[in-house]
Amino acid sequence: MNNKTKKNKTITQVYTQPIYCIKQVIVVVSNDMNSLKKYIDKSIDLNRYTNADGLTFNNVTYKNKSSVCIYLRPSEFSDSVDNVAAHESFHAASAILDCAGVKLCSNSEEAFAYLVGWINECVMKTYYKWLKK
């Protein structure tokens, strides 16, 4: 299956993060950036991000819960999906831990590492669902 066949396909997953003040991680995997409009502030101009392979939006409220939203523009043929997923996972983890008052330092590396790993796993699970659809 080529990218033209999958062009308008969107997979969205909402993952619960029960430990910190931001309770949800929303992952949107789509070639259509407009699929983000349901989750992000209406004032955000998505045209500014047309070349982005990934984005993370903080301060998102979805179903009355504080959330972060990660967008991944997928490609079946790209070697960079893992890198983009890890990059955006770090941004999301930083937002979540910042909300909890945890700053990145040698004493907080484990908290960051575990949270980045968990978020990256969520992003990749959603991406693999996109590939299979």
Regions found by a protein language model. Give the residues of each.
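N-terminal low-structure segments adjacent to metalloprotease catalytic domains
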Residues: M1-S35, S67-C69, C105, Y128-K129, ...
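Active-site scaffold of zinc-dependent metalloenzymes
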Residues: K37-D79, A92-A95
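Short coil/turn segments at secondary-structure boundaries
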Residues: E76-S80, L104-N107
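Compositionally biased, intrinsically disordered low-complexity segments
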Residues: V14-Q17, N47, H87
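Short alpha-helical catalytic segment bearing the HExxH-like zincin motif
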Residues: S80-S89
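Catalytic Zn2+-binding segment of zinc metalloproteases
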Residues: S89-S106
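Post-HExxH zinc-binding segment in Zn-dependent metallohydrolases
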Residues: L104-K133
